Amino acid sequence: MKTLQRFAYLTWTGIAAIVLAAVAPAQSRQAPTPNPALLVLSKQDHALAIVDPASLHVVARVPVGDDPHEVVASTDGHTAYVSNYGFGAFHTISVVDLLAQQPEPQIDLGPLHGPHGLAFVRGRVWFTAEAAKVIGSVDSGSRAVNWIMGTGQNRTHMIYVFPDAQEILTTNVNSATVTIFEHTDHPAGMQRPPQGGPNWQGAGLPPPGPRGQGGPPPGPPGGDWNETVIPVGGGSEGFDVTPDGKQAWVANAWDGTISVIDIAAKKVTATLQANARGANRLKFTPDGSRALVSAGPEVIVFDVATQKEVKRLRIGHGGGGGIQMQPDGRRAYVAFAQDGFVAVIDLRTLEVVGKIDAGGNPDGMAWALQQ
């Protein structure tokens, strides 16, 4: 009887161990984090894969919570931040120590639901929060939200922050728009009202200051932001800014076009009939000469100067997602969710030269360069 009981106990503990292993987030470590490292999110595995771009092998997998969509690395390459999207249900940003290859406590965004697009600029994690219709930033030191700005647009999805953090662009999918935010010390449209008496302060406006002092009233501490909303094509989602900062190209998934925006003029200067329905992401090469678009099973390559298609590669069966360019400009990496791999494209020959198994349903990617 004791033998049977012991066998039953061992059998049950063995089954329990197998079940727990099956449901627990995958975490493994095979080698130190390379420099640079390609970071790839697996939505299915709820994990961040750390990839060695030299060997195209995954050196570690780190759990990052439910529904991870986008990832960005800190400037020093030591930390990764991952948006837990949930189509508006979630409100966290997961954090990974890339050197230790371990998860850290999540950042809770409170009522700012649906975090998606990410950028890391000047020590801050900038994010979109779709369900809250805002963009915001988190101080990477305190890991607390330190700035929020409403967009008034539907599904503010992706974000680009200029290196000086004085200008921000977002795509707003369901509004079919792009928003340009510009930091200013003097908000547009604020003019000093006429004074009605010695103690008149205006209706809900800042105090006009000493009598006889000209100019507009002072803005809020730290300045303000001017917002320009630019109509583009339907389903505006993936976009990028040229390396010189002059243009933004926006992939419009619903009508398959690409909108070219003059950022200084704040207007669309060209609409390319790209035949890119379902376009998910768009990325420029580091030298700015070409733009790559992921659209379903295809990657479409454009010459930026001529705005003409150069080549169309059919790679997967569908679900083309995140795109990243190797920092030296030699390769592009494109995630194909339905196929479960990341395609590696030689940017000189425009041919697929490898594939990375980064986990099920790969999508968001980023580079981590250790400093």
Predicted regions and their residues:
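Predominantly soluble domains enriched in secretory-pathway, periplasmic, or organellar proteins
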Residues: 10-14, 18-371
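N-terminal secretory signal peptides that target proteins for export/translocation
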Residues: 1-6
